[in-house]
Regions:
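Catalytic core of PPM/PP2C metal-dependent serine/threonine phosphatase domains
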Residues: 4, 21-105, 114, 128, ...
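GAF sensory/regulatory domain recognition
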Residues: 16, 107-108
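Extended hydrophobic-aromatic, low-complexity segments
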Residues: 22-24, 89-90, 100-102, 108-112, ...
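Active-site-proximal, acidic helix/loop segment immediately C-terminal to a metal-coordinating Asp/Glu
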Residues: 22-48, 135, 139-190, 206-212
């Protein structure tokens, strides 16, 4: 996507509240609205915006639509833009699991606290914060739903639900930030109890592109 004559990679990862049909409905709403936003953004009239403004407007549009469901449908998301030439990341996190940085073989979280609630919760826009993070060449940003953490672990007679969010960092390192390998490492560690989706964005300036 192009904004103010600069090219950006756009990404979103979300997890709708609810089971079965309700959760699937939330995902469909997110996909439909997000596709509309992207289509509109391809029109030159809408390209003269700063990335922060684009994210704010996208959030407000999603917030308005999900809030119209009167509490029956919320969704957590990470929505972001990466400037292709500089690797500067702009993003919002609406009560989604923390964003992971994989740099030089080490995984860590780039967030320490979350201030924004799930999209659809009334008055959520008052807590909107557009966050920035400078990616370096070779960096990978990893985002995933809470299925990455909600795992049944241990032996059959003493199984418990994992409560250690740092375990996911270990899986990222073990899998060298490869999505398929990370998924396989998660399966070896425990039984997945919730929906799992994973997304990564890697900054490769030498290729003059950012891979997703």
């Amino acid at each position: 996507m192009e904004l103010c004559e600069k090219k950006y990679v756009v990404f979103v990862n979300g997890d709708a509240m609810g089971k079965s049909i309700q959760g699937a409905g939330g995902a469909l709403v997110l996909g439909t609205v997000f596709n509309t936003i992207l289509t509109r953004s391809s029109i030159s009239l809408h390209q003269n915006k700063k990335p922060e403004k684009w994210l704010e407007e996208a959030f407000l549009e999603l917030q308005k639509i999900f809030e119209s469901f009167d509490g029956s449908m919320y969704i957590s998301i990470v929505l972001g833009l990466v400037e292709e030439n500089t690797g500067l990341l702009y993003y919002i996190n609406a009560e989604h699991p923390w964003t992971v940085l994989y740099r030089n073989g080490v995984a860590s979280y780039i967030e320490e606290e979350l201030t924004l609630r799930k999209i659809g919760i009334p008055e959520n826009e008052e807590h909107l914060v557009i966050k920035n993070f400078q990616m370096l060449p070779g960096d990978t940003i990893m985002i995933g739903s809470d299925g990455r953490d909600d795992l049944l672990i241990g032996k059959e007679e003493n199984r418990v639900i994992n409560e250690d969010q740092n375990q996911f960092l270990k899986r990222v390192e073990e899998g060298n930030a490869d999505l398929r390998k990370i998924y396989e490492k998660i399966l070896k560690f425990g039984v997945i109890l919730d929906d799992l989706s994973l997304l990564k964005v890697t900054y490769n300036p030498e290729d003059n592109k950012t891979n997703e």
